Amino acid sequence: MHEVVTISVSQRANHLTTQFFNIQEGYLQLSKEQQVNDSKIFLNSVVDKVSKTISYAPRALLWDARTGNGSLGTYQYSESQDYHFGNEDKFKEQTVIKTHPRIPKSEYQSSLDAGAPLPCLNRENTMYWSDYSKLIYGPSSFNILRNWYHDTENPNQPDFQNLGERKFDRYSIGYDEFTENYLQEFFDGNLHRELEKCDTLQGFNLVSDMESGWGGFSSALLVELRNELPKKAVFSWGHNEDDPFTDDFPMKRLSKKWLPIISNKLRSTINMMQESDLYFPLYAAPGLTNWETAGKSCRIFDSINATISQSNLEQRKTMDYLTTAITLGYSSRNMVTGMVIGDTDYSFCSRVLPFKNSHKPNSTHIFSKSFIDRGNQTHKHHSEPDSRSKMIEMYTHRYFPSDTIPTEFSNDREFVLELESSEKNRDIFKHWNEFVVRYFKNDSDREELKNELSDYASAYESGWYEDEDSGDDDM
C-alpha cells in the first residue's frame, strides 16, 4: 500500500495539512468508476462490522500550541482527558483550572455536524484550521505544547504560559522544547501508534515554519525520525516569509534586528536539507492569512502527493522516484528551487535577490527540470530519471480542490507544475554565509555553519565566478 504519514508542526502547517486532507475527503465522495487515487495511502480505514460501514481518518500527526486546535482544543487540568466532553465523572476528585474562555465551534463545523448548507468561508471565520476541517482525526493525531498557548494576534508564534512576555520565536527554544520534553513521549506514543496502522510505510511529509521556534522543534523531531527510520523517505515543507534578502522587501540595508529571524531560517533550512530526501521551501506571501496561504500552497503540496497516490499504476510514482527526478542522485541538491504553475512561482527561492557575483538571471544554470501534468490523460509516455537526463515528465489526474480553498486559488484545475533545481539556490547560501560571517560573533557553531553554507553554495555552482570580498565588518 505504501502509506505516507504527514507530520504537521505549527498552526500555519496545520492549515495546509487541513486543506490537503479536505481534498482527500472529497475523493471519498467519488464513485468507484470516478476514483482517481488510492485513499489508503493517506487515510487509515476502519471497518465497523456491525454497521457495515467504513470510516477514514488522516494518517497525520499534528503539533500545535494550547488552544491552537480551536474548538477541538481541551481546557482542563489533564492533557489526556477532556473535562468538557462527557468525562466529568473522572474529574470529581480533581480541581479543574480554566485559564481562558472556551472556543466555540465554528459555523462551518456546526453546519457539517447538522448536515445543513455550508456557509462561505472568509478571512474572519477561518482563524483556526479546525474551523473548516472535514475529516475526523484520531485522538493520537493531536500533540500539544503544554506550556505554550496559541496567540490569535500572532498565530504563528505561541506565547509562553499565555503571559504575553515570551514568544516561541527562536530556533533554540523549539529545538530544546522537543528534545527535553517530548522526544521520548512522541516516538514511543503517538508516532508509534500511527506507524502500527501502516502495512508498508513509504515515508513522511513534514510540514513546518522556518522562522520561529517551530523550525527548531521540527528540526529536532526530524533528526530523531531519521535515526529511528533511516530508510524511509522524507519530504519536508517549510514556510518562508520575506526578509532583507528578498526582492519585495522594502529595506535595502540589513540590521542586527534580523539576526534571530535569519538565524532561525538558515538553521532550519540546513537541517531540513540534511535530514530530508527533498525540501520544498514554500513562500508565505505577506497579507495572506494562514487559511489563504494554505489554499494557495496546496496546489503544490497536493500535486506532489497526487503523483504518488494516483490509482493509475502506470503513472504512479514513488517518493524515491521524485527525489531522483529532482536531485539526479546529488543528495546535496535536494532543495527545490522552482515550483512554477503558469506565471506563479510558489518557491521562496525565486524571491531571493542575486548575490553580488552571481550569473545573470537569464544565464542561470538549470541542473534538473521536472513536469507534473495535471490534465485528464488516461495514459502518457513518461521518462525515467537518470544522471544523463535533465528533464522528467510525470502525469497525474486533474486538481480536485476542496470547497474550503479560497476561490482565487481553486479555479484552474488542469495545469502543469514545473519543478526546477538550479544555480539560483547558490544566492541563498552565499547571502546566509556572509550574514553568519558578519553577525555570528559568539555563536559556538559559527564555523560549522560557515562550512555547511559554503558546501551547499558550492553544490549549486556552475561555471566561473568573479572574486568576491567578504569581511567581518558590520553592514
Curated annotation (Swiss-Prot):
What's a BP term from Gene Ontology annotated to this protein?
Answer: mitochondrial genome maintenance
Q: Where does this one sit in the cell?
A: Cytoplasm; Mitochondrion
CC per GO annotation: cytoplasm; mitochondrion
Keywords carried by this UniProt record: Cytoplasm, Mitochondrion
Annotated InterPro entries = DML1/Misato, DML1/Misato_tubulin, Misato_II_tubulin-like, Tubulin/FtsZ_GTPase_sf
Residue ranges of the TM segments: none
The UniProt similarity line reads: Belongs to the misato family.
What job does this protein perform? Involved in the partitioning of the mitochondrial organelle and mitochondrial DNA (mtDNA) inheritance.
Name of the protein in question = Protein DML1
Q: Which organism is it from?
A: Saccharomyces cerevisiae (strain ATCC 204508 / S288c)
Q: What is the lineage of its organism?
A: Eukaryota, Fungi, Dikarya, Ascomycota, Saccharomycotina
